[in-house]
Amino acid sequence: KAAQVLSPALQQYESAFRRAGEKYGVDPDLLMAIAIHETGNGTSSAFRNKKNAMGVSPNGGGPRSFETVEAGIDYMARQLARNYLGQGLTTIAAIGKKYAPPGASNDPRGLNSHWVKGVSEYYFQLKA
């Protein structure tokens, strides 16, 4: 199903999403849904220029750079396992309140208000 939802830019990393998900106990479809939403399905400059497939922006700074796309996926899976799922935030809505809170200082254009809906839509497409 992922091949029908992921753009070619992200399709080549499907196995990395699956490996990271298995390694940390995170649903790979959730990782892919977040990546699709955060990167405009592989079109964002953060993805193209910084190998950041997950929208990681520490402390309100700009997008974090990674050595490889796979390293960024692994990092985000570990963070989700430790700081979200491991703390009982197990739904997309619960994760979104912490991961992309509307009105956050690093969200000047109000895009976080679309995070839960966007990630949920991609997640259910991947699960269909």
Language model features: what each stretch is:
Residues 1-128:
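Catalytic cores of secreted/periplasmic lytic hydrolases that degrade extracellular macromolecules
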